[in-house]
């Protein structure tokens, strides 16, 4: 069975932790390195407690260099929104390495990235070298709406009520992400202006 050698940039956050959990349990995935400048040198399980006993890897302080890149097939970018574009502008990644970005930076399919919703364009994604992972709200809404749009049965406006958890805001603290505020509470979040609306419109237009 083929093994894909994988590197992760930004592995200390919530997105990186969940990706690590999935990859460590995937039979075709082999982790080569997990980069985190804030946790460099620390065991991964110290940050992601649920991975205790799953891996002995420590967070890397720097990217591979030179021929070390030959041991990497796929690179995941799990940095915050706006950081992936900056990362690729300043770092030289060999062109034969597939890049999968989990931020919002390339979901508009800029810079050679393909929008990574398999239900929309599975074969295109298979051939792509750069893939932009869809947003959470966008994915859930597209899976419901795109089949209706493709069948041309959408005759009026679509109204969606969606609720996200605390982790959607990342690890950085703010007044509205504390448990004492979130517990048993709900609030309106970017109604009619959410950034995922552009993704959904783009996908519908592509049909």
Where are the model-predicted features located?
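Oxyanion-binding "anion nests"
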Residues: 192-207
């Amino acid at each position: 069975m083929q093994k894909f050698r994988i590197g992760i940039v930004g592995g200390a956050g919530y997105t990186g932790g969940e990706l690590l959990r999935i990859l460590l349990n995937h039979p075709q995935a082999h982790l080569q390195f997990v980069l985190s400048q804030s946790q460099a040198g620390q065991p991964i399980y110290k940050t992601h407690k649920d991975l205790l006993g799953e891996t002995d890897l420590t967070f890397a302080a720097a990217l591979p260099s030179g021929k070390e890149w030959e041991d990497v097939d796929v690179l995941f970018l799990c940095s915050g929104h706006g950081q992936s574009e900056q990362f690729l502008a300043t770092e030289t990644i060999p062109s034969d390495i597939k890049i999968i970005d989990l931020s919002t930076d390339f979901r508009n399919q800029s810079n050679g990235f393909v929008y990574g919703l398999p239900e929309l364009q599975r074969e295109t994604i298979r051939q792509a070298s750069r893939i932009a992972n869809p947003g959470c709200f966008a994915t859930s809404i597209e899976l419901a709406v795109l089949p209706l749009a493709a069948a041309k049965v959408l005759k009026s406006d679509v109204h969606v009520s969606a609720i996200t958890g605390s982790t959607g805001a990342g690890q950085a603290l703010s007044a509205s992400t504390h448990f004492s505020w979130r517990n048993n509470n709900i609030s309106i979040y970017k109604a009619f202006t959410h950034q995922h609306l552009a993704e959904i419109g783009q996908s519908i237009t592509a049909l």
